[in-house]
Amino acid sequence: MKVFFAVLITLFICSMIIGIHGVGINVKCKHSGQCLKPCKDAGMRFGKCINGKCDCTPKG
């Protein structure tokens, strides 16, 4: 159980670090699937929909 908790905390911290480096682009969205192509076209690796706008994670 302690190992599971440690892995869970590690994943949470890593996801927060990735989210901090997000770059917002001016593309409206309703779900994250709509952000994949605009983010790749902008030279980014991943994209997710946050508050109705695409938030992209840079390559690196």
From Swiss-Prot:
Positions carrying Lysine amide are 59
Q: Which cysteines does the record link by disulfide bonds?
A: 29-49, 35-54, 39-56
Q: Which UniProt keywords apply?
A: Amidation, Disulfide bond, Ion channel impairing toxin, Neurotoxin, Potassium channel impairing toxin, Secreted, Signal, Toxin, Voltage-gated potassium channel impairing toxin
Signal keyword on record: yes
Tissue expression remark: Expressed by the venom gland.
Subcellular location(s): the record lists: Secreted
Instruction: Spell out the protein name for this chain.
Output: Potassium channel toxin alpha-KTx 3.6
Q: Which organism is it from?
A: Olivierus martensii (Manchurian scorpion)
User: According to the entry, what is the taxonomic lineage of the organism?
Assistant: Eukaryota, Metazoa, Ecdysozoa, Arthropoda, Chelicerata
